Regions:
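Bacterial N-terminal signal peptides that target proteins for export
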Residues: 1-9
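Post-signal peptide N-terminal segment of mature Sec-exported envelope proteins
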Residues: 31-46
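Long, charged/polar, surface-exposed segments that mediate recognition or autoinhibition
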Residues: 76-127
């Protein structure tokens, strides 16, 4: 085989792999997302049995190696694919751990994105204060919020539909972490 033929075959295989990973990304169910997140960070404990659905949202509780508990909320499209992912915690004293987990959520949900740029734009100095930050790419909208009540992070896949409604508010966090159903919004 000539060098050109080998190069052409390599490019075709690379393009096929890239296209298949994009196709897998848009067809990720909440269960697959949670499995991939657990695989990405072996220190996370994902409560698969405790997850529940409310309308088009799947809620799941996750705790890290340090014992901090988080709430993950995944909004799904009509076909069951994850359209948005939200992460929340009331542990404002564990901001660094929250930022690290937000980076892992980003790497699983939108692996082709510049995770370092997103996390640094959203969390700036890593300090907690009453503020919201947004970061947009061609395909995703990222947002974060922090207050004395908790920390919040979300990713919306803009190609899968309109921007989702907020999964939860910072005021809802203590209820979520006490294993109650979400309040009416």
């Amino acid at each position: 085989m000539s060098r050109r033929a080998v190069t052409a075959v390599f490019l075709l295989i690379s393009a096929a792999i890239a296209l298949s990973s994009c196709a897998l990304q848009t067809e990720m169910s909440p269960e697959i997302f949670l499995e991939r997140l657990a695989e990405a960070d072996k220190t996370l404990s994902v409560d698969f049995d405790g997850r529940y659905y409310s309308g088009d949202r799947c809620y799941c509780f996750v705790s890290d190696g340090g014992g901090t508990e988080y709430v993950l909320s995944m909004q799904t499209c009509a076909d069951g694919s994850v359209q948005s992912v939200s992460l929340a915690s009331t542990a404002v004293d564990r901001t660094a751990a929250f930022i690290s987990l937000a980076g892992k959520v980003t790497s699983v949900y939108s692996p082709q994105e510049d995770i370092k740029a997103i996390v640094s734009a959203l969390f700036l100095d890593g300090k907690v204060g009453e503020r919201c930050e947004y970061y947009n790419t061609r395909r995703y909208e990222y947002s974060s919020a922090s207050s004395e009540n908790g920390l919040y992070f979300s990713i919306d896949d803009l190609r899968l539909g309109e921007r989702s409604t907020p999964a939860l508010t910072l005021g809802d966090l203590s209820g979520y972490l006490n294993r109650t159903k979400p309040s009416a919004q």
